[in-house]
């Protein structure tokens, strides 16, 4: 299964590579083989990149799940206007080889949605969180608030977000993607009990990032 957010890019890539493949037939053999090989590799990588495997929802109302596949780059305390004082920032780095479909971390309603144009610093640069192009999203329910950002990077220059203000969402739902790698920052309220550590690998919609106390399924 392939991500619907990448269908246009995937179609363009396939057509371009197909054209290059057949044009290579008119070239000398020494040039023909590398062009055909490169075209085939580009097609295979595109198909691999835009894959969209099924995920099993956690099914626990107290769980805040990872919004992205990747590796936890940073965990630190921070104050934030949406989640309040003593919140926790968890940054997830997505390499070009991760699944790039993003998923909702918690049940609730979208109450904040804001796009910020910006730079394209490397995802490992901590300034990328504030300086890079990003889409900020805030979700709240009767018990809690969660804020997260799709952050573009040096290679990832296309953020896709199919959310609207006041939209009701459920944890694990697909909502967009960041094409060709970068990071996703999630900010959790002070009462959230962090359930992972730096270096941990995550799976969107399945890995529990934190738990909210006194909330039952």
From Swiss-Prot:
Q: State how the cofactor is bound.
A: Binds 1 pyruvoyl group covalently per subunit.
| Protein name (record) | Phosphatidylserine decarboxylase proenzyme
Q: Where is this site: Cleavage (non-hydrolytic)?
A: 181-182
Where Pyruvic acid (Ser) occurs, the residues are: 182
Gene Ontology MF, one: phosphatidylserine decarboxylase activity
Gene name, Swiss-Prot/TrEMBL: psd
What membrane topology does the UniProt entry give?
Answer: Peripheral membrane protein
Does the record bear Calcium in its keywords? no
Q: Sum up the protein's function in the record's words.
A: Catalyzes the formation of phosphatidylethanolamine (PtdEtn) from phosphatidylserine (PtdSer).
Some GO term, biological process aspect, for this entry: which one? Answer: phosphatidylethanolamine biosynthetic process
